[in-house]
Amino acid sequence: MRTEWVAKRRGQGNVTQMHYARQGVITEEMQYVARRENLPADLIREEVARGRMIIPANINHTNLEPMAIGIASKCKVNANIGASPNSSNLQEEVDKLNLAVKYGADTVMDLSTGGGNLDEIRTAIINASPVPIGTVPVYQALESVHGTIENLTPDDFLHIIEKHAQQGVDYQTIHAGILIEHLPLVRSRITGIVSRGGGILARWMLHHHKQNPLYTHFGDIIEIFKRYDVSFSLGDSLRPGCTHDASDDAQLAELKTLGQLTRKAWEHDVQVMVEGPGHVPMDQIEFNVKKQMEECSEAPFYVLGPLVTDIAPGYDHITSAIGAAMAGWYGTAMLCYVTPKEHLGLPNAEDVRNGLIAYKIAAHAADIARHRPGARDRDDELSKARYNFDWNRQFELSLDPERAKEYHDETLPADIYKTAEFCSMCGPKFCPMQTKVDADALTELEKFLAKEPVTQG
């Protein structure tokens, strides 16, 4: 749908949405986002120009349906997919993409580290995707040197970053905030460095005793991103991997650097969002969100979870959705889903579904809490359907209609029960929603109460 939109921009030195927004131009992508968000187009332009909102939209991803990530827009959810050396293949990843989009993923990250030709997998995902696609280029950089981290050069990183941009990737996680002087700060941690990309760069710095090449070559990356309108997703290499490590000196030192890099990218009109933790106790979530806004000048915050406890392997879509809902309420713009397989293995299709629904709940709850326009409309419609025993309408309005119908039909499968005024929980005689109080009866009762004392017993 964007082929004609981007045709006139090709060949220009800077084609970012932020660049046009700062020139006072409302692009077709901004207009599309305004309609999706039910917000004025000029507000979208202002938020993009200010850096509080991004529209990840690589000019080479022409089948993209533009969306926004920012505090003024609805809270978004990202789903991670990706093949590994031990599991999955191209078709499985495209199937996961389609499943993620079906269940409401607003963006999808391809985190493939193996399982076939990474370029073919990525290209297939981009070509099939109506939502923005993100990647972590350092993974393919490592694959290009056959896993020998010490052999990586700055040019290796830049080559892969530009390749992803050319292929149509809308945002890239760039681990430029972890500096060599930050590494001693992880000494007191239980889980050290838990970011895959951050771990790769830490090992490179420890071997070479040189500064992070993504930091020293950040200007070169900016120039690449300007030409394709790739958004930065500044990686939090030192995010806490357990609640013990949350909000420590290592995390906050990197966050300060991420703020500096954000403003450097903005000087060139390149869009930025900033990634965040991780594992954070509930009482520290508000601090983390506000600290990010302060250090990063209100660039959109994109958090993984956070998990609020570490003791529930197999249920971390729940431990993290609790933290995600709180983070969204405090102003986080996008939540990266966590599946039940987190810390245990590569998620399958059912894990993707469960993780996504948990996070759609968290994001929607945050939208309601922040009083975003129209956020509660669907809740009210479903509640009316529930009160009227309109079972099919309830299923239709559910985040996961198939699961809602499946659970209802487990005990009452016959079609006749789709019009019944009860479910199997209370049965036909005890459902409280059968108590329909007539408006006229209430009016008469009010008149009675106004003039007669209530008889006890």
UniProtKB/Swiss-Prot annotation:
Substrate binds at residues 80, 109, 139, 175, 195-197, 236-239, 275, 302. GO terms for cellular component: cytosol. Keywords: 4Fe-4S, Iron, Iron-sulfur, Lyase, Metal-binding, S-adenosyl-L-methionine, Thiamine biosynthesis, Zinc. InterPro entries: ThiC, ThiC/Bza_core_dom, ThiC/BzaA/B. It comes from the Bacteria. [4Fe-4S] cluster binds at residues 423, 426, 431. Its EC number is 4.1.99.17. Its cofactor is [4Fe-4S] cluster. This is Phosphomethylpyrimidine synthase. It is an enzyme of class 4 (lyase). HAMAP family: ThiC. It catalyses: 5-amino-1-(5-phospho-beta-D-ribosyl)imidazole + S-adenosyl-L-methionine = 4-amino-2-methyl-5-(phosphooxymethyl)pyrimidine + CO + 5'-deoxyadenosine + formate + L-methionine + 3 H(+). Catalyzes the synthesis of the hydroxymethylpyrimidine phosphate (HMP-P) moiety of thiamine from aminoimidazole ribotide (AIR) in a radical S-adenosyl-L-methionine (SAM)-dependent reaction. Pathway: Cofactor biosynthesis; thiamine diphosphate biosynthesis. Binds 1 [4Fe-4S] cluster per subunit. The cluster is coordinated with 3 cysteines and an exchangeable S-adenosyl-L-methionine.
